[in-house]
């Protein structure tokens, strides 16, 4: 496969963009490769600047559940752009989009649109602190909630200890307000609340983890979280930036029948444009300005292009109800990867929830970040490079999810598994 133009562009990009990219994972460092530069996409396929064609399982990291350049989504963007791109003022589209989100997600009574998932989680944390008048928050090791300072925090030594900065630039004093616990460990949550319960504002969690690779919650885990947070008067925040409108129309909370106090959204609700949102019970959301004292604002929040794309995608998802189809596609890939593993003798653990999948190169059950990290990242990197060479575009990290869309056909899935078999044979 010829990647000459991509290589040249990457060399040029590094002169002007930090690391040559605008988000670290795009640099392909974790898979020991140079990034490919994409020029177009359609359906489940993308093409790079060297005209190489790929079946895409990244889908812009999840938003494109209907595939690239869906005709109706593109037409909605084109049509609304004729009237302007941003007004910094209320529009009818914002109201319609809010109604669509509230109609879909039972726990959401009011919503506020922002420009990214990071903004959504930062704002939800601020709101939780303002509403409860408490300082500490709980997050889970391996769950990513954007790059806000309170959330980019690593676990301290031992269970229920205060967090430490996950990157230079975050003050230790701020990091210490975040308690980082192991995912799927309800005893650790109970211990943290026994120790700090009166000062814990909220628990924020990916209801299905996607940023350590796909890790499903253990049975009754969310129900226990709901009970504990209610007992201590803390808010439960579901970060559904990845899972919202992907695992079901009502998100992971519909799948697991749990109502959090606040929910954050992103990805799918923007149809591929920059959008985030946070919403929840009216009495909590009314603490947000201009009604309440918790300040949050944004120049481009609710901009008409993003609202048009997002609303069209949500309307299509409601109409098509593709979730059973997506789940069946996911199951086909899951079973295919497991069969390939058995036939080639390359040990993997395949975790899947709906249309989100991760193939972990380990022989240990993956239930949290510690077990995810038993994966052989060097072996994954070889697998990634082999698949890329064969025209299959996967996430450039062992610890990310593969995403499926309605545009992936049975033939695409079979082609992917055939090529995966060839790559596994090279690894065995």
UniProtKB/Swiss-Prot annotation:
Any one GO molecular-function label of the UniProt entry: transaminase activity
Pathway: Porphyrin-containing compound metabolism; protoporphyrin-IX biosynthesis; 5-aminolevulinate from L-glutamyl-tRNA(Glu): step 2/2
Cofactor: pyridoxal 5'-phosphate
Location in the cell: Cytoplasm
Modified residues (N6-(pyridoxal phosphate)lysine): 267
EC number: 5.4.3.8
Signal sequence range: none
PROSITE patterns (UniProt xref): AA_TRANSFER_CLASS_3
Gene3D superfamilies, alphabetized: Aspartate Aminotransferase, domain 1, Type I PLP-dependent aspartate aminotransferase-like (Major domain)
Pfam families given in the database record: Aminotran_3
Gene Ontology CC entries for this record: cytoplasm
Reaction(s) catalysed by this chain's protein: (S)-4-amino-5-oxopentanoate = 5-aminolevulinate
SUPFAM superfamilies xref list: PLP-dependent transferases
Alphabetized UniProt keyword annotations: Cytoplasm, Isomerase, Porphyrin biosynthesis, Pyridoxal phosphate
Predominant subcellular localization, coarse grouping: cytoplasm
InterPro entries listed in its UniProt record: 4pyrrol_synth_GluAld_NH2Trfase, Aminotrans_3, Aminotrans_3_PPA_site, PyrdxlP-dep_Trfase, PyrdxlP-dep_Trfase_major, PyrdxlP-dep_Trfase_small
Transmembrane segments: none
Similarity section: Belongs to the class-III pyridoxal-phosphate-dependent aminotransferase family. HemL subfamily.
Subunit structure: Homodimer.
NCBIfam families from the UniProt entry: hemL, PRK00062.1
Protein's UniProt name: Glutamate-1-semialdehyde 2,1-aminomutase
Species this protein is from: Sulfurihydrogenibium sp. (strain YO3AOP1)
Gene name of the record: hemL
């Amino acid at each position: 496969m010829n990647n000459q133009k991509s290589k040249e562009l990457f060399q040029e990009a590094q002169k002007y963009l930090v690391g040559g990219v605008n988000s670290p994972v795009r640099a392909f460092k974790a898979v020991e490769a140079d990034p490919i530069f994409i020029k177009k996409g359609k359906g489940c396929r993308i093409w790079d600047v060297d005209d190489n064609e790929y079946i895409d399982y990244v889908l812009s990291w999840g938003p494109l559940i209907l595939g690239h350049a869906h005709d109706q989504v593109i037409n909605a963007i084109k049509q609304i752009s004729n009237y302007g791109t941003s007004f910094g003022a209320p529009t009818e589209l914002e109201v319609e989009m809010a109604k669509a989100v509230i109609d879909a997600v039972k726990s959401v009574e009011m919503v506020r649109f922002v420009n990214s998932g990071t903004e959504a989680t930062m704002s939800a944390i601020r709101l939780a602190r303002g509403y409860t008048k408490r300082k500490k928050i709980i997050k889970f090791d391996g769950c990513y909630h954007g790059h806000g300072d309170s959330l980019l925090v690593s676990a301290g030594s031992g269970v229920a200890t205060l967090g430490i900065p996950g990157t230079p630039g975050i003050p230790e004093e701020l990091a210490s307000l975040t308690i980082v616990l192991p995912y799927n460990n309800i005893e650790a949550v109970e211990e943290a609340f026994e120790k700090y319960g009166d000062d814990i504002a909220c628990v924020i969690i990916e209801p299905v983890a996607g940023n350590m690779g796909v890790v499903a919650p253990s049975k009754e885990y969310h129900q226990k979280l709901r009970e504990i947070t209610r007992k201590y008067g803390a808010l439960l925040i579901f970060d559904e930036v990845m899972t919202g409108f992907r695992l079901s129309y009502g998100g992971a909370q519909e799948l697991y029948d749990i109502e959090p106090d606040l929910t954050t959204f992103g990805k799918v609700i923007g149809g591929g444009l920059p959008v985030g949102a946070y919403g929840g019970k009216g009495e909590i959301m009314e603490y947000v300005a201009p009604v309440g004292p918790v300040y949050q604002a944004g120049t481009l929040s609710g901009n008409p292009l993003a609202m048009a794309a997002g609303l069209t995608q949500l309307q299509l998802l409601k109409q098509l109800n593709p979730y059973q189809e997506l789940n069946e596609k996911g199951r086909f890939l899951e079973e295919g990867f497991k069969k390939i593993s058995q036939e080639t003798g390359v040990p993997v653990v395949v975790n899947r929830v709906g249309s989100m999948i991760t193939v972990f190169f380990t022989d240990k059950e993956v239930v949290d970040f510690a077990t995810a990290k038993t994966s052989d990242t060097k072996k994954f990197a070889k697998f990634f490079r082999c698949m890329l060479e064969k025209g299959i575009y996967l996430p450039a990290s062992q610890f990310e999810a593969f995403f499926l869309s309605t545009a992936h056909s049975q033939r695409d899935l079979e082609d992917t598994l055939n090529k995966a078999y060839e790559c596994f044979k090279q690894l065995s």
